[in-house]
């Protein structure tokens, strides 16, 4: 089955910050190429790195890798974000479920949906990219309990994916 990579959007491709008052997080991330302000109506303010997009396009094109959106952007990720920033994610499967979120009872919709998808699709290993993983104890426990290799990456929301994160991903899928 290969590797399934589950991807959030904000805090992954969009380094969240108010770009009117801050500079891109190039120094903190290791991405020295062009950074651009996010200009998509309704999105969080921030920057996106052309280097991150190129690296993720390379990862997504790797044989045996299937990428799926797991983001509150839902349909907006493949239809708005991906084409705007040049990410080859318009054809990635989008896993809906944000309407089912129940944080008051400690039930994070993303954990529910990734569990269901892993049980259904049975990948050999998974990569989970989300800037909120480390804040959900149930997600951290689930990742440790899985009987397949897992790489869970939780970037700082204001930085997004770093060069070191992409190196980890590329080594994991190799």
Task: Enumerate the predicted regions with their spans.
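C-terminal cap/substrate-recognition subdomain and adjoining C-terminal extension
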Residues: 76-174
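Alpha-helical substrate-recognition element adjacent to the catalytic core
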Residues: 1-102
């Amino acid at each position: 089955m290969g590797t399934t990579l589950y991807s959030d959007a904000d805090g992954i491709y969009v380094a969240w910050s108010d770009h009117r008052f801050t500079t891109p997080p190039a120094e903190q991330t290791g991405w020295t190429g062009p950074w651009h302000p996010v200009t998509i109506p309704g999105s969080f303010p921030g920057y996106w790195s052309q280097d991150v997009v190129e690296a993720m396009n390379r990862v997504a094109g790797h044989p045996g890798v299937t990428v799926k959106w797991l983001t509150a952007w839902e349909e907006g990720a493949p239809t708005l974000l991906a084409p705007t920033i040049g990410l080859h994610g318009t054809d990635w499967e989008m896993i809906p479920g944000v309407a089912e979120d129940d944080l008051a009872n400690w039930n994070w919709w993303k954990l529910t949906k990734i569990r269901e998808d892993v049980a259904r699709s049975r990948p050999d290993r998974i990569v989970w990219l989300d800037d909120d993983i480390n804040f959900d104890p149930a997600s951290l426990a689930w990742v440790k309990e899985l009987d397949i290799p897992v790489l869970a990456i939780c970037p700082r929301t204001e930085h997004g994916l770093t060069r070191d994160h992409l190196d980890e991903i590329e080594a994991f899928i190799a």
